[in-house]
From Swiss-Prot:
Transport recorded as keyword: no
Keyword Transcription regulation: yes
Organism whose genome encodes this protein: Bacillus subtilis (strain 168)
Stored Gene3D superfamilies: Type I PLP-dependent aspartate aminotransferase-like (Major domain) (3.40.640.10), Winged helix-like DNA-binding domain superfamily/Winged helix DNA-binding domain (1.10.10.10)
Sites of N6-(pyridoxal phosphate)lysine modification: K308
Entry protein name: Uncharacterized HTH-type transcriptional regulator YdeL
């Protein structure tokens, strides 16, 4: 394979990040196909006149996010295909079509987008300057492998107040996105153990578990959350759940189901990975405590991120380890360099400490509550009895079950012809996927575009 990235040494972006982005972009564009072998670290380092460490860090990040896998005595192979990730951008068949698609003005209901127009850039800039003034040359030192102590302390305090999470700063590990933290977590456990995984569930997490030789045990999800009886029948060593806003269906795990899951984990000395996906955004009913906050036996690993509530590009996530896993977790983490810069961490710490974070999250909750109301009203008005809405009580997207004579793929293609991007749901399933359900993320779409986009769906589907 010919690798010809242009690595710009004059940029502030590290070379390994530039190399990582090159591979990621070319996989998304289809230029690097699933199964293709990547150059060895030594060969690529020599070819690009960079260190093997630079190549290794780029490959590690790609592997952590599920883009490549290492095969013993064979090397690194591309493991990415758009269909592997349920809501990734759908590829064009040619570079010309790809370029035309990128230049087109879409109404894009991607679930991962946020409304950046409300980001408090002036307050963030002030926090950046304050952190520079306060820490100065300390910012040039290598970051603590667990993350900066001040930020870890503030995260522990915030999680206790907002989600009832009980932890100290020594239990907090910071990383550049949940995939990297999951990669670290997988190495805390022995290979070939079994992990109960929500079906449907988060595809990227599944790929990371598989890449780390874990045995995936699909567990169905109903209106109350993951099915405990199926867990008891399968007896996995671990269970991965998204209880605040089930990744695909959008359901909120009931308090009764949470207690049952915790009881099972305690009785079987098993661990639960609680991915608090979209936990900040709930629109109806009383907030349900986190599993970690309810846990009395140290069986829950808690994961969260600032990506949805701040900006995805900031890439700051965190993982809370229970005390039985601390020693091994710290040992594994020490093998990696910290993936979030000191400056970014200390800027966020200033942002939280000065009260800007709480003001911002309150503002975004109000904004997204309004957008949710707009999308629900527009769907009911324009699409009416031809659809059923699901997952609307929390999070930043909804599902539509469509009662029309079109399958999922055709529904998406018809929408694209009218300038609207909606996304499939079926690829999140391992068994019995729905054939006529699509996902609409509303956070990153303007209020006027939400209304216009739903009107265009009505026209596209000839309702």
């Amino acid at each position: 394979m010919d690798i010809t990235p242009f690595l710009n040494r004059t940029l502030d972006i590290p070379l390994y990040q530039q190399l990582y982005r090159y591979f990621k972009e070319n996989m998304h564009r289809g230029r690097i196909q699933k199964g293709m072998k990547l150059p060895s670290k030594r060969l690529l380092a020599n070819q690009l006149s960079i260190s093997q460490t630079t190549v290794e860090r780029a490959y590690e990040q790609l592997a952590a996010e599920g883009y490549i896998v290492s095969k013993p005595r064979s090397g690194w192979f591309a493991d990415y295909h758009d269909s592997d990730f349920a809501y990734d951008r759908m590829p064009s068949t040619t570079p010309i079509q790809q370029e035309a698609e990128e230049n087109k003005q879409w109404i894009d209901f991607h679930y991962g987008n946020v409304d950046s127009s409300y980001f408090p850039f002036s307050a963030w800039r002030k926090s950046m300057v304050n952190s520079l003034d306060q820490y100065g040359h300390e910012l040039y030192r290598p970051g603590h492998v667990l993350g900066e102590f001040e930020l870890r302390t503030l995260i522990a305090e915030y999680l206790y107040q907002s989600r009832g999470v009980h932890c100290g700063p020594e239990q907090v590990i910071i990383g550049a996105g949940n995939p990297i933290l999951l990669q670290i977590l997988c190495q805390v456990f022995e290979p070939n153990i079994s992990i109960g995984y929500e079906d449907p569930g988060y595809p990227r997490a599944r790929k990371i578990f598989e890449a780390n030789r874990m045995n995936i045990v699909p567990i169905p999800v109903d209106d109350e959350g993951i099915c405990i009886q199926k867990i008891k029948e399968q007896q996995p060593n671990l269970v991965y759940v998204t209880p605040s806003h089930q990744f695909t269906l959008g359901t909120i795990m009931t308090i009764n189901r949470r207690i049952q899951l915790l009881k099972w984990a305690a009785e079987n000395q098993s661990f639960i990975i609680e991915d608090d996906y979209d936990g900040e955004f709930r629109y109806t009913g009383q907030p349900v405590p986190s599993l970690q906050g309810l846990d009395q036996h140290n069986r829950v690993i808690y994961m969260g991120t600032f990506s949805k509530s701040l900006l995805p590009s900031l890439r700051i996530s965190y993982m809370i380890l229970p005390s039985p896993l601390l020693k091994k977790g710290h040992e594994i983490t020490s093998l990696y360099k910290q993936t979030v810069s000191c400056h970014s961490q200390l800027t966020l710490a200033e942002f939280i400490k000065n009260g800007e974070w709480q003001k911002h999250i309150n503002r975004m909750r109000k904004l997204y509550r309004k957008k949710r109301a707009i999308v629900l009203e527009a769907v009911q008005r324009e699409l009416g009895e031809h659809v059923r809405i699901r997952g609307e009580n929390s999070g930043l997207r909804i599902l539509l079950d469509v009662y029309l004579p079109f399958g999922e793929k055709e529904l998406i293609e018809k929408a694209k012809k009218h300038g609207v991007k909606i996304y499939p749901v079926s690829l999140s399933y391992q068994h019995h996927p729905p054939t006529k359900t699509v996902s609409l993320g509303f956070a990153g779409v303007s209020e006027s575009d939400i209304r216009e986009g739903i009107k265009k769906l009505k026209a596209a589907w000839k309702i």
